[in-house]
Amino acid sequence: MIARLRGTLLEKRPPTLVVEANGLGYEVEAPLSTIEALPETGREVILHTHLSVREDGQTLFGFRTRAERDLFRRLIRVSGVGPKLGLALLSGVDGEELVRCVRDDDPKRLTQVPGIGRKTAERLIVELRDRLDGVGGGSTAAPAAGADHPTGENDPVSEAIEGLVALGYKPPEAARMARNAAEPELGCEAIIRRALQRAVPRGG
């Protein structure tokens, strides 16, 4: 089991990262909260990881804190929630808010995440309610300097569209969301975060 990865950040293409360690390039999938907190490419990063092994391949998931990884592991134990959906949940709702939704019995907030219907949201709340002791999501870490700015020459809007599609949105919807959220000087991660925040109105 790979529990921790330390190396040079080569690529940031939400939700995918490439980290080079000891001459090997590791492809890592990470929630938006983790990607936003990382430095620019070329810098050293440390990720707490979870390796998912299935018949069709292996996927390495990375998180900026142990608490966020632990929350992910609790999520994927819920019936009907696999690693991909768990990643989408932690990208659409940050860890602390997810914990709040469970403790406040608020399934409506969770149903705004692609792939989460009413029944799945209610099941999440029921099954997670007694599993969250000591878990807060670890979302208090501040984003790294420069995280809200483009990290390469690629169009941040196009990369944001790709990221939203990877999180479960249909391409036309992802394009609309990204373009509506885009502003000059915003990088890919910031556009995705803004698009997700607009898609999930608070207090609704």
Swiss-Prot record:
Region (Flexible linker): 144-153
Ranges where the record places region Domain I: 1-64
Subcellular location: Cytoplasm
Gene Ontology process terms (BP): DNA recombination; DNA repair
Annotated region (Domain III), positions in chain: 153-204
Disulfide bridges in this chain: none
GO cellular component: cytoplasm; Holliday junction helicase complex; Holliday junction resolvase complex
Function: The RuvA-RuvB-RuvC complex processes Holliday junction (HJ) DNA during genetic recombination and DNA repair, while the RuvA-RuvB complex plays an important role in the rescue of blocked DNA replication forks via replication fork reversal (RFR). RuvA specifically binds to HJ cruciform DNA, conferring on it an open structure. The RuvB hexamer acts as an ATP-dependent pump, pulling dsDNA into and through the RuvAB complex. HJ branch migration allows RuvC to scan DNA until it finds its consensus sequence, where it cleaves and resolves the cruciform DNA.
Family to which this protein belongs: Belongs to the RuvA family.
Subunit structure as annotated in this protein's UniProt entry: Homotetramer. Forms an RuvA(8)-RuvB(12)-Holliday junction (HJ) complex. HJ DNA is sandwiched between 2 RuvA tetramers; dsDNA enters through RuvA and exits via RuvB. An RuvB hexamer assembles on each DNA strand where it exits the tetramer. Each RuvB hexamer is contacted by two RuvA subunits (via domain III) on 2 adjacent RuvB subunits; this complex drives branch migration. In the full resolvosome a probable DNA-RuvA(4)-RuvB(12)-RuvC(2) complex forms which resolves the HJ.
Protein name: Holliday junction branch migration complex subunit RuvA
Organism, scientific name: Halorhodospira halophila (strain DSM 244 / SL1)
